[in-house]
Amino acid sequence: MRLKKLPIRRKMPMELAYIEKLFREEVGLDIKEHKDKAEQISETVVEIYEELLRKGIENANYNGRDYVSYYDLPITEDLERYMNRFIQDRGEEVLKAFVDYLAKLEEELLKAEEALPPLDEELHQKKADILGGIMLMFASVAKQINGDRKLYAESIPVTREVLRTMI
């Protein structure tokens, strides 16, 4: 089964405060006063997750399975490092609101996944870690591209493309 586009809603209900606090305290990047940037960032995170899931579906089909395993997803070493960082920082106050947001996002993804092959339990359990890792990776790459504390709108598409090549 090859999907052109996963049926996941693009506009995520992420408040600017979640991303703003995460970016400022984790990598020192300021996105204050720009709600549209938060929406672009959350859309990018979901797009990257969709790409991973799409490739995971292809790998599961290639291996003759009718379910998708966590190990079917092409998790790179870089993404795994950011996932581990997210897991370690999950208890910190800066990430609590973001983890709560990820729980809401997971509900949205589960609704969309009804049209997909079933996902194994480990993949369900690691979904928030994957999304959080992608978000931290986005923040880190954006900081390197911008070079200072402010996130510029024109750097978001560049960051998106860099992430696509890294993952």
Curated annotation (Swiss-Prot):
Q: What GO MF terms are annotated? A: protein heterodimerization activity
Superkingdom of origin organism: Bacteria
Pfam family of this protein, just one? DUF1931
Q: What does the sequence similarity comment in the record state about its family?
A: To A.aeolicus aq_328.
Q: By what name is this protein known?
A: Uncharacterized protein aq_616
Organism whose genome encodes this protein: Aquifex aeolicus (strain VF5)
